[in-house]
Design a protein with these regions (language model features):
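A residue-level marker of the well-folded mature domains of exported/periplasmic proteins
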Residues: 1-272
Length: 272
């Protein structure tokens, strides 16, 4: 695309830490570089970032975790465990920081207790977002910390890990804890409707794609795009101006309404 004279390049990076050379070449060619869904790390050569508000995602997950536990058991304290995403994913730490913005005060005042004691991103991350890594870690935590203790809830950053966590708790003969998720994966919607997984996050990627198209259109028309400067979009070299969309928390109660317009997910929610 660079050699063909592209004026704008939209990059959806699987690993945002590996593209420094490529975006430098794009910038040198005069192209506008737009990171889509995941930020591109450790480079000055990213002009814009289009994504859902990932800090808000984490906040919503933590709020859902607390609400789910309170609905199940009115009085705390609540025993919880924390899982975060892959350290090579620029979004993972932002999700976690958003969640801890809500949970840390509850940890500090004793409302919730992380029984394993693992509360940092480095202690809770899941390399590669791999289900087997989350399942193995959950099994280890249950063996070491929950022999005679009830696990009330688990902060899971996405649906794949949520299902792995539930697999581990079932294998250990434990009741299902309140477990959060993200991405509205088709395998998790039935679990949510049955009350096994408590929540997920819906991010309408059609809206996200349209936001990137609109950004390019504004630039082509000579308009200044409406962006925000947010420290959570710091890529290690700069705070990348961002177009942020609003994520939606989904539980059993609002799933059908939340998925209106997405025929596949709406149908799964209606099936229950």
């Amino acid at each position: 695309m660079i050699t063909k004279g592209a004026k704008a390049i939209i990059i959806g990076a699987a690993d945002g830490s590996q593209l420094g050379t490529q975006v430098a070449a794009a910038k040198k060619s005069g192209a506008v570089v737009i990171a889509w869904d995941r930020n591109i790390l450790n480079t000055e050569n990213v002009d814009y970032y289009v994504a859902f508000n990932n800090f808000k995602v984490g906040q919503l997950q933590a709020q859902a975790l607390l609400e789910g536990m309170e609905a199940k058991k009115a009085d705390g304290p609540y025993n919880i465990e924390l899982f975060s995403g892959s350290p090579d994913d620029a979004n993972a730490k932002v999700f976690f920081n958003g969640a801890m913005d809500v949970l840390q005060p509850k940890i500090d005042d004793g409302t919730v207790k992380v029984v394993s004691g693992r509360t940092s991103f480095s202690e809770t991350n899941t390399q590669g977002w791999l289900a087997q890594n989350a399942q193995s870690r959950m099994t280890d935590i249950l063996t070491k910390s929950y022999t005679n203790t009830e696990l009330d809830g688990v902060l899971s950053p996405n649906d794949t890990l949520a299902r792995a966590i539930l697999t581990a708790t079932k294998a250990a003969g434990k009741p299902n804890p309140i477990v959060t998720g993200q991405d509205s994966e088709t395998a998790s919607i039935p679990l949510i409707m049955k009350g096994e997984q408590y929540s997920t996050i819906y991010k309408n990627t059609t809206e996200e794609a349209q936001a990137a198209i609109d950004l390019v259109s504004d630039l082509a028309d000579g308009k200044k795009p409406e962006t925000k400067e947010d420290k959570n979009n710091d890529n290690g070299k700069k705070i990348v101006p961002a177009v942020e969309l609003t994520p939606v928390l989904v539980t059993k109660e609002n799933a059908v309404e939340a998925y209106k317009g997405n025929d596949t997910l709406e149908e799964l929610a209606k099936k229950g």
